[in-house]
Amino acid sequence: MSSAPDPFQHEVARIALAVAGRHGFALAGGQALIAHGIGARPTEDVDLFTDVDGGVTAAAELVHATLLDAGFQVDTIAEPTELDDVFYGFEHDMTEFEVRRDDRTVRLQLVRFARSTSPIVLDVGPVLHLDDVIGTKVAAMVTRAQPRDYIDVAAALGRYSRSDLVDLALRADPALTDEEFQDALQRLDRLPDTVFALYRLTPAEIRDLRHAFSDWPR
């Protein structure tokens, strides 16, 4: 699969970052991986992270108004995000929007989250440093264990060793344990190939994904 952003999601991210960047926000999540040239799986949301206290509150209305001015429909989402299942406390400093135009919809999340390295600037705007993106992705694989998490981490194994990935995950979430890592790999073994096919992986790509984790402890 080629690594290219979805044009609609890329536009939403670019417009939001143009005003949220002043409050420390940078592109995170699957969109950030694509911006760094890693992976190309379909994504359902746009994640923007800041390490600035009060940044979410300061940017939320600005982002909302700017997207409206750009011709999007924007609604605030009240229910808790699944990100709170990955990192404790996300619901206490975050805002989520549903952004629509014509028949396209994407969820936009503004989140307060610590980072270890300064973001870089790419064509979309500020993007989390790859180490920070990967750290959150591996932590998500361990705690959330969704098929997309394994896809993202397997793609990162082309640039990072297993040891490096574990270290970055522990930097993002120091509470992770060896047992949780092992449980995550056991869950991978139980997942049927059909769940990965939903992300447009071919049978050969699914085999490669499983092989990428073959030497991880279970």
Language-model regions, residue ranges each:
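Compositionally biased terminal segments of proteins
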Residues: 1-218
